[in-house]
């Protein structure tokens, strides 16, 4: 196991071929909200509700959510890659809790925390 201060190492490839790629802490996102499809498109209602939630959160708290959108797939699949380091700890926790609450009923949305933006170009 390898450790580094500003980046982490991730093993790629098979176990016989040891190759490592660097993940810089700047490329990590607090959240990745992934709207995916299993043959009939994404959950558009949940996406619209989540877009509305982000705008309302920004207005209510006078902040900007740092959001990168990465599209992938052929049925509208999209990842919302969100950095929250410009928010106070309290607002970060509130945003994460609210995000979990907004997407909890959808079977076509996944949430990842402290991760990279998989499809970002």
Task: Annotate each predicted stretch with a short phrase.
Residues 20-29, 64-75:
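Short edge beta-strands and adjacent turn/loop segments
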Residues 39-40, 85-91:
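Helix N-cap motif at beta-to-alpha junctions
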Residues 60-70, 110-115:
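Short beta-strand elements
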Residues 44-65, 99:
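Short amphipathic alpha-helix segments
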Residues 93-121:
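C-terminal partner/receptor-binding element of secreted or periplasmic proteins
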Residues 71-85:
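Surface-exposed aromatic
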Residues 10-44:
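Immediate post-signal-peptide N-terminus of mature secreted/exported proteins
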Residues 2-6:
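C-terminal motif of bacterial Sec signal peptides marking the signal peptidase cleavage site
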């Amino acid at each position: 196991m390898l450790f580094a201060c500003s980046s982490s190492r991730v093993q790629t490839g098979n176990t016989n071929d040891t190759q490592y790629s660097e993940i810089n802490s700047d490329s990590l996102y607090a959240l990745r909200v992934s709207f995916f499809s299993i043959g009939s498109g994404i959950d558009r209602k949940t996406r619209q509700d989540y877009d509305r939630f982000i705008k309302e959160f920004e207005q209510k708290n006078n902040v900007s959510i740092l959001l990168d959108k990465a599209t992938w797939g052929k049925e509208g699949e999209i990842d919302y890659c969100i950095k929250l380091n410009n928010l106070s700890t309290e607002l970060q926790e509130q945003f994460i809790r609210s995000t979990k609450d907004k997407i909890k009923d959808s079977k076509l949305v996944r949430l990842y925390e402290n991760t990279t933006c998989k499809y970002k170009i």
